[in-house]
């Protein structure tokens, strides 16, 4: 009868271990201005002394069971499970990795930003040729998917989270300021 107990305990212990591994815990996904990415259990705090790669482009509040999207200049959103991004307990840029290498994208493609892929996420984006588009929670369940059709020679140059009451501002290469209502 002791064999029956041990055979019942082993699967239960394995199931508990799997639940612990997949616990949905809060985390932050950090994309630096220099193209490094990491997952941290704590938010970055201002440092008295600057470090290499410490300028933050995007900070996404997420959880280990959520997905994050990385939008690239070719108009593709790359879906990544937060738990797949290398983690550090305390925010430490030295533990980050190159986001382009992590995503496996080409050298001529730039990562423009990291975004939560939730039902209330709205992303405003603009292209080199002046196309402005808002993407409202139409996130396909694929690992990578197009979010905008680009004409030959065009590319995304900027993207940011947006709401209806935001104003979109673009600065052209000849220093003109272009303003659009987000809605």
Regions found by a protein language model. Name each.
Residues 1-183:
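Short, structured "edge-of-domain" segments at secondary-structure transitions
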